[in-house]
Amino acid sequence: GDINAHKLRGDKRQEIPGEAGGLNTSSAVHAAGACGAVEGRGMGDNTRAMLLTRGLAEIVRLGIAKRARPETLMGLSGIGDITLTCNAMHSRNFSLGVALGKGETLESIMKSRKTVAEGVHTTAAVTALAKRLDVAMPLCATVDQVLNHGADIDEAISGLLARPLAHE
C-alpha cells in the first residue's frame, strides 16, 4: 500500500542495510537519550544539536561499516528518525534521557513506565558491535556507561563535551 498521505510523505528505497538493518534506529535511540539528558539538565538547544549531529555521524559510520548506503542514512530513516527521536517528548528514549537528566534513577523510571525505551536494552549490543567493527561511537559508548555501568551523568556529559575536535 501507499503510505503517502496529506500529512505524511515517504520515499522509495530498496536498500536493506540502511533501511531495515536496525542500525539507524538503534543508534538514534542513544543520541535521543543523550539529548534528553542535556535537556533535563537545562543545557540548551545548541548542546542538544551538537549531540544530535554527533549521533548522526555515528549512525553513518556504523551504517557504512555494515554496507549501508550513506544516502539512505541521510533520508527519512536516518536524519528523519534521529531528528524526531532527539526532539520529541513522546519519544520514549528522549523522555527517558530527560528524566535521567533531572536526577531520576533508571530503576524508578523503568518501574513507572508502561512502554519500553529500547535504548536501555540495545546500548550494550550496539557498543559491542561498534567495537567489533572498529567503528568509533563515543556517544553510544557514553550512554552505555550511564545506563549499564553506573557512570555519573554529569561526568558523562562533560566527557562528551570535552572530546578533542575532529572532522565529523
Describe the predicted segments one by one.
Residues 5, 17-20, 25:
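Short linear motifs in low-complexity or flexible loops
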Residues 9, 15, 39-42, 56, ...:
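NAD(P)-dependent Rossmann-like dehydrogenase/reductase catalytic/cofactor-binding core
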Residues 44-55:
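Active-site pocket-shaping loop/turn-to-helix segments
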Residues 22, 31-45:
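Internal nucleotide-binding/catalytic subdomain
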Residues 21-24, 36, 55, 119:
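Glycine-centered small-residue hotspots that permit tight backbone geometry or close packing
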Residues 26-29, 117:
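Short glycine/threonine-rich catalytic loop with a Thr-x-Gly-x-Asp
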